[in-house]
């Protein structure tokens, strides 16, 4: 059973979609939430972050983005006139969960966390990245279905609690997405929404989640960069079935 998602004003969208499985419901929900945005914020003007800070995060990264990169660059070219900060090819990622600031997490805790995640109760899975929607600070792909991503978040959150790390937002507030461009100033949202809308007819791109990455994340030149601590493999469905037999 997947954990329940709740309404959370700090999340975007604040309320979860009616279904965590139905792609049409999720994509439409993301789009309607973006359409209601009146002003976009400067993504980089965020409390708790500076260029000198380093934080541990669980992410899914794309060493070989392939078709995802093609679709991303197509959308970025179409939005170039907006002057947003495009996510570079080697910066594409899906953020899963914050672990904690580097100075708040000991080496022993990192090792314990990695030990705890060697046998996550979540099998490798596939999702689709759908062009295109956005938030108050970014333009982003919608991801479907949410259910396996929510299960992965919950498993990582549980491991973090067991390891005693500061942790991030609860699973109830998790809203999966994949950002492709960040707003670098306060701006009126309707112009961005109008530019994004024609791109919604593009077909989705399949993404394969076979690993989850613990990274040391930093902000650099108005993008995110990271050092991968370890890529943790997710068991195949066949392996999981055998283990449960």
Go through each PLM region and give its residues.
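Histidine-dependent nucleotide/RNA phosphoesterase domain, centered on the 2H-phosphoesterase fold
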Residues: 2-245
């Amino acid at each position: 059973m997947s954990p329940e998602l709740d309404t959370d004003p700090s999340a975007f969208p604040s309320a979860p979609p009616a279904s965590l499985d139905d792609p049409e419901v999720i994509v439409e929900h993301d789009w309607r939430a973006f359409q209601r945005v009146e002003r976009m914020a400067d993504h980089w003007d965020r409390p708790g972050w500076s260029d000198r800070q380093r934080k541990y995060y669980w992410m899914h990264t794309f060493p070989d983005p392939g078709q995802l990169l093609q679709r991303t660059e197509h959308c970025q070219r179409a939005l170039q006139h907006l002057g947003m900060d495009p996510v570079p090819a080697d910066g594409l990622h899906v953020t899963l969960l914050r672990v904690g600031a580097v100075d708040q997490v000991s080496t022993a805790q990192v090792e314990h966390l990695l030990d705890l995640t060697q046998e996550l109760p979540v099998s490798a899975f596939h999702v689709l990245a759908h062009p295109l929607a956005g938030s108050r600070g970014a333009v982003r792909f919608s991801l479907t279905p949410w259910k396996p991503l929510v299960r992965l978040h919950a498993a990582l959150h549980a491991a973090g609690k067991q390891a005693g790390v500061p942790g991030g937002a609860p699973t109830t507030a998790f809203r999966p997405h994949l950002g492709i461009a960040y707003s670098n100033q306060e701006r009126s949202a309707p112009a961005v929404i109008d530019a994004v809308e024609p791109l919604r007819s593009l077909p989705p791109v399949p993404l394969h989640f076979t690993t989850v990455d613990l990274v040391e994340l930093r902000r650099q030149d108005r993008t995110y960069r990271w050092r991968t601590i370890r890529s943790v493999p997710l068991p195949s469905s066949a392996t999981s079935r055998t283990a449960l037999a």
